[in-house]
Curated annotation (Swiss-Prot):
Pfam families: Fungal_trans, Zn_clus. Residues 37-63 bind DNA. This is Patulin cluster transcription factor patL. Signal peptide: none annotated. The keyword Metal-binding applies. PANTHER family: REGULATORY PROTEIN GAL4, TRANSCRIPTION FACTOR ASQA. The gene is patL. One of its GO terms (molecular function) is RNA polymerase II cis-regulatory region sequence-specific DNA binding.
Length: 809
């Protein structure tokens, strides 16, 4: 009658709902937020206190809760205060732990020193951490590597991919394969050594400064009289001193006067390595002025100029023997002597020797702590001199490293000395007063602007090489030319990095810019003639020209890797082809500037770097012509080669190497003519048997030649617009009319294409091996006439778009 109820409700529920699903746990209470984000409030959904909130993270949109939460109430402020207190407590605990570990390491080091008698330097945290990352070091892979020159006599020398020697090797390899000739027959490898005929017969070597030669006391150097020495030393102050301001003129004059004290009128001065190396540099420079006015004695003038270098080289060797004994206790004067030794080697194109000697010179500068902030109490004029010396070494280091494609020796992270200045106070401290009549510059402004330019270009090239290593890491390819996508990625990256160089151009003082005739601008590639200011001081004219030549020279080495042999379709690499043409424009700018200046003035007469700039510009122009025999900029490039040969003829009377260089350019240009003639004949040759355009053979003939694939437009249309620019000279008038007729009445590309797959319709990329094995492809005249114009609609570049590339600085 009475029912029994169990007090255990959970057991009763479990027995009653044994087969039912268990009751789910209650949903946790959501965290309260002071203010929801804008998106959650707009959609009236629950928000959280994350930054950004979870809803915005899930949808991938912007969240307004990105700023740190501000305390809007007293409890929130108390929570924020408590959080900060806890954070401070944690940081204090970390500091205490670090101090204890440092004391333990110091105690252990003291015990080791007490037991062994030798101190062990403590390892930094970075080094300690590096041992744990040894697996990463063992797994590192090399990136883009250079190519050793063929026929190397001294073993394998490394020339990086940014060097001109690497580019010469690429040109030589391409010529050898395209012309079916061995490498030794291309005559271009002789230029890698920068022409041996130009250097002295006895090159400087370590034996010149060996202890045996010093103990023997043999010195074949013929001393000069004081008037003769002063004649050559006077050339220093208007030439090299304005470019490399590393000597205090008043201090040097007092020092030079002391060398002649207590000597007889017919006697010789006291030994001085600084004076000897300055005489070597000035005699090499002054020998270029010792030419005859008779044009019939050009060969004799060249030999006379070459023989005039020998006395200067004898002074250089004697300076090296004297400097060898000063290495243990160097001084600023010893450092100055080494710097001008590098300049001398650079001027006679012994670049490897100069680069090796630069390493010794930098160690001397480190020993004298020139790379650090000057000590307190150092006179201001001494501080400024030390800064000028150090940053001159920086310029030489980067110029040689970029030329040879090798890593820089100076690490900017270890340098704490400031940049030199060019204000009136700095002019007073330098001890040299050269009036220019311009308020915005001084004679030191060139040095400062060169440092800033090299710093900007070095950053661009370092970032570019790092990007190359990242893309090539893990890839079997050894260079960037196998994958068009990689090349285009690098071109896009380089274009972004060039912003620093463009900013430098905008900030160059107006008085250091070379004026142009017409509407031309300085540091541009618009090919406008210079408006030379012959009334300015000679040193200022030279500084303006050298600054712009250095700018174009550095950009040539930056853009040069994008010249490809043979090029691929430009529809895949429009940015890379833009850099290709920019490199050519800078090369032609150097040629035009040097030809005008050497023809109209004597400002750069005898200036050795000008010859080296011209040679690198010639290599770039030759490479472009060989890689792109038929394209809009090629006629201008070929004219620029003729201008460059005339420039070499102008300096041939005082640079014997220029005569050899002109002959090499003529020979290689003839080979380029043969390639162009072969291609031109393939365009005009009518084949006896016509194959169907839709057959496999016909499809192969419709493929464009490799030289024309290089410059196709990235933006492709269904029909070709009216051509407003002239076509290459290989096209006949009748062919031109047919092409224009076809462009006026275009045929839809879908009606012209065979019914094949899209892969078969796109023009295949012509690799280097394929182009060399098959030779230059034979294209019938129907391709130009319009009967086989399929590939032109797929990849031909609109000629009007070339202005976008040629006007880029």
């Amino acid at each position: 009658m009475f029912s029994t109820f169990s007090a255990n409700l959970e057991a009763t529920d479990a027995s009653r709902d044994g087969s039912a699903t268990p009751v789910t746990a209650p949903r946790p209470k959501r965290s309260q937020v002071a203010r929801a984000c804008d998106w959650c409030r707009l959609n009236r959904i629950k928000c959280d206190d994350k930054q950004p909130c979870q809803n915005c993270q899930n949808r991938g949109g912007h969240c307004s809760n990105t700023k740190p939460l501000e305390a809007t109430s007293l409890p929130a402020a108390n929570r924020e205060i408590q959080r900060l207190r806890n954070k401070v407590k944690d940081l204090q605990e970390q500091i205490r732990t670090a101090k204890q570990e440092a004391e333990i390491r110091a105690h252990a080091q003291a015990q080791i020193q007490a037991s062994t008698g030798y101190a062990t330097p403590p390892l930094s945290d970075t080094v300690n951490g590096s041992f744990s990352n040894s697996e990463q070091l063992s797994n590192t892979k090399e990136g883009w590597q250079g190519i050793p020159p063929a026929g190397n006599r001294a073993g394998v020398l490394y020339y990086g991919p940014m060097s001109s020697t690497y580019f010469v090797t690429r040109i030589t390899t391409y010529l050898a394969q395209a012309m079916n000739q061995p490498l030794v027959d291309t005559k271009l490898e002789a230029c890698v050594a920068r022409f041996d005929a130009r250097t002295p017969a006895h090159r400087p070597s370590r034996s010149d400064a060996s202890p045996e030669s010093q103990t023997e006391g043999t010195d074949d150097t013929e001393d000069l009289s004081r008037s003769q020495e002063e004649y050559f030393l006077n050339l220093l102050w208007q030439s090299f001193h304005c470019v490399y301001p590393i000597i205090s003129e008043p201090d040097f004059r007092r020092y030079y006067e002391s060398l002649w004290s207590n000597t007889s009128p017919e006697g010789t001065r006291k030994p001085s390595p600084l004076v000897d190396v300055l005489l070597a540099v000035c005699m090499q420079y002054g020998s270029t002025f010792l030419v005859r006015g008779d044009e019939n004695h050009e060969a004799e003038d060249s030999s006379h100029s070459e023989n005039a270098n020998m006395p200067g080289h004898a002074f250089y060797q004697r300076a090296q023997r004297l400097l060898q004994s000063e290495l243990e206790h160097p001084s600023i004067m010893v450092l100055q002597s080494h710097v001008y030794s590098i300049i001398y080697l650079y001027n006679i194109s012994l670049l490897n020797t100069a680069h090796i000697n630069l390493g010794v010179t930098l160690r001397i500068a480190h020993t004298l702590r020139l790379h650090l902030r000057p000590l307190d109490g150092t006179p201001p004029e001494v501080q400024e001199l030390h800064r000028n010396i150090w940053w001159t070494l920086y310029r030489l280091d980067n110029q040689l490293s970029m030329t040879l494609g090798r890593p820089s020796l100076i690490q900017n992270s270890q340098v704490s000395c400031g940049l030199p200045g060019d204000s009136r106070d700095h002019i007073r401290l330098s001890g040299t007063v050269l009036l220019s009549g311009h308020e915005d510059i001084s004679w030191l402004s060139f040095h400062v602007q060169c440092i800033k330019l090299i710093f900007a270009v070095q950053g661009v090239q370092a970032a570019f090489q790092l990007k190359c290593s990242q893309l090539l890491n893990g890839d079997e390819a050894k260079d960037i030319y196998g994958d068009p996508r990689m090349t285009e990625t690098l071109a896009e990256f380089l274009g972004r990095e060039m912003t620093a160089v463009h900013e430098w151009v905008q900030n160059v003082p107006q008085s250091l810019r070379n004026a142009r005739k017409g509407a031309g601008e300085a540091f541009s590639t618009d090919r406008a003639a210079l408006n030379l200011d012959l009334y300015s001081p000679l040193w200022l004219q030279r500084q303006r020209l050298l600054l712009e030549l250095l700018y174009h020279h550095l950009l040539i080495s930056t853009f040069r890797p994008f010249i490809r042999f043979p090029p691929t379709s430009s529809s895949l690499t429009p940015l890379a082809d833009g850099h290709n043409i920019s490199c050519l424009n800078h090369a032609m700018a150097i040629t035009n500037i040097l030809h005008q200046v050497l023809s109209e003035t004597d400002v750069l007469r005898g200036w050795s770097p000008a010859f080296q700039y011209q040679w690198d510009a010639i290599l770039c122009t030759l490479g472009f012509v060989l890689a792109n025999p038929v394209c809009p900029p090629t006629p201008s490039a070929r004219k620029s080669l003729q201008t460059a040969v005339r420039t070499l003829d102008l300096v041939g009377d005082h640079f014997p190497a220029a005569v050899n260089a002109a002959q090499v350019v003529r020979e290689v240009n003839c080979r380029a003519d043969r390639l162009v003639d072969t291609f031109r004949q393939s365009l005009t040759r009518r084949q006896g048997q016509r194959t169907s355009p839709f057959s496999p053979t016909g499809l192969q003939k419709m493929n464009p030649p490799a030289s024309q694939l290089a410059f196709s437009s990235a933006a492709q249309t269904a029909s070709i617009p009216v051509l407003s620019d002239p076509l290459p000279p290989s096209m006949s008038a009748s062919s031109l009319e047919l092409v224009r007729a076809r462009t006026i009445h275009p045929v839809p590309s879908i009606e012209m294409m065979p019914s094949t797959s899209p892969t078969d319709l796109s023009p295949p990329l012509v690799t280097t091996a394929e182009s060399h094995s098959a030779g230059l492809p034979a294209v019938s005249v129907d391709v130009i006439a319009g009967n086989e114009v399929h590939w032109m609609q797929a990849s031909a570049m609109i000629l009007d778009s070339w202005t976008d590339f040629t006007t880029n600085p």
